[in-house]
Amino acid sequence: WGQAPDGSRYLAKRQEIGEIPAGWNVPVLMYHAVGDEIWGYSDLFVSAAGMEAQLQYLQENGYETIWFSDLSHIEEYEKPVILTFDDGYDDNYTVLYPLLEQYQVKATIFVIGNAMGSPHKMTREQVYELAASGLVSIQSHTYTHGNLSAMDEAALRQEMELSNAALAAATGQIPYVLCYPEGKYSYLTMDIAKEYYSFALRMDGWTYQTGMDPYQVPRSFVSRRITLPDFLWFVNPSGKTN
């Protein structure tokens, strides 16, 4: 069960994922913070103007932003792209969310289960609002953002179960996508993840092609230094392969 900010309770549900057609190129882009106030590693912060320019490019050039659940009907999209944001920073709500609304763009945000409400992170109420917006899919970045490659089975299960419980309580949806913290995972991590999720994401690689291992989905890192010409390389190719 989850509880909304107004105190009402609801039954959390898991997203059902159908069979995914093979042979489609789907760029998966990896972001973190969005904004001009830099308080940490600068490459993690894409400027507000840079983010808007990228969204504008996608819109003007016929790209369609999708969620991972949309992959089961990928044939409906000519130029699909998935935007992902790691860690659940508060600027995802204050800076990114207004841009998503302005351009009607979908995004997936990976929230750390025990970090909601901590400094520089979104509050539970903000996570709830984003999840209810129709533009944002809230997914798992584990419970503590620990090193999954160093954990045994019991610790891995605890990370995933506590994360899922926290996010289900906040959003009413049980996560179906896992983002490996810092891209660290092992064969054991993947084996356990298959029991809880339909997809799991890396922090490196290039374009994801449907039919690849869904527990090693590659992503392109969009840093603050990325120019618009660089960005074009990240989103091509997109669509049906030959």
Indicate residue ranges for each PLM-predicted region:
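Surface-exposed cleft-lining segments at the edges of enzyme active sites
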Residues: 83, 111-116, 145-152
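A short, conserved beta-to-alpha structural element at the edge of catalytic cores
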Residues: 104-124, 129
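Histidine-centered catalytic micro-motifs
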Residues: 33, 137-145
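C-terminal active-site subregion of NodB/CE4 polysaccharide deacetylases
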Residues: 14-84, 89-91, 129, 133, ...
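Boundary regions of SH3-family modules and the immediately adjacent low-complexity/disordered segments
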Residues: 2-20
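Acidic/His-rich structured neighborhood in mature extracellular/periplasmic domains
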Residues: 94-95, 103, 134
